[in-house]
A protein has these predicted regions:
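RNA pseudouridine synthases
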Residues: 1-195
Length: 195
């Protein structure tokens, strides 16, 4: 159920039986999932939780909204790093709803960078760097041209052996580059890694 823009872990099964068992396991929310998301703004708290129903936006089949209608969803968020005007968050969903993290972040006023569906704008170097000089043709490419959401870790019980399985995926290169430029040019009070 990953969005096509989300980088990171993709899980494939070798048989229909494995697919069915993994599907049952994931559907029962018995796995532990961890995402990293770069957002506009900064939460007041170091950790916070959003418990808000998620439902479809009328007339928009690809957009979900957090509010009073829809299915219950819960996501815990932890600050990983603060940068002036931006924050890298660890996202720990305990339910599995379409666009859950993105809708919950929009609901809290912290839209994901690059996520036009959920209120985020593209990350442009010209907005960060003083004395920025564009290319000769005057164009500028965004530092990140997708929603800044990365599937970093998945823990679950193997469907046949019962062994604990943990899969980790390092941050995608485009997000690493975006963070490099943010660390260099978007510094300020309260910026930096959180211990």
């Amino acid at each position: 159920r990953l969005d096509f823009e989300t980088s990171g872990i993709s899980l494939f099964c070798k048989s229909n039986e494995a697919r069915q068992r993994i599907g049952d396991l994931l559907g029962a929310n018995q796995e532990k999932r961890e995402f990293l998301c770069l957002v506009h703004g900064s939460p007041q708290e170091e950790t916070f939780e959003v418990d808000a129903k998620i439902g479809w936006v009328t007339g928009e089949p690809e957009i979900m909204v957090a509010g009073k209608r829809g299915k219950f969803a819960s996501t815990k968020f932890e600050v990983v790093e603060r940068l002036a005007g931006f924050t890298l968050l660890r996202c720990l969903p305990s339910t599995d709803r379409k666009h859950q993290i993105r809708a919950h972040l929009q609901h809290t006023g912290l839209p994901p960078v690059g996520d036009a569906y959920y209120g985020g704008s593209l990350l442009m170097l010209s907005r960060l760097k003083k004395n920025y000089r564009p290319r000769r043709d005057g164009t500028e490419k965004p530092l990140l041209d997708r929603a800044a959401l990365h599937y970093a870790k998945l823990k679950f019980e193997h469907p046949f052996t019962g062994d604990a399985v943990e899969i980790e995926c390092g941050l995608a290169k485009d997000m690493e580059v975006a963070l490099k430029y943010l660390r260099k040019y978007a510094t300020g009070i309260g910026a930096g890694p959180v211990d």
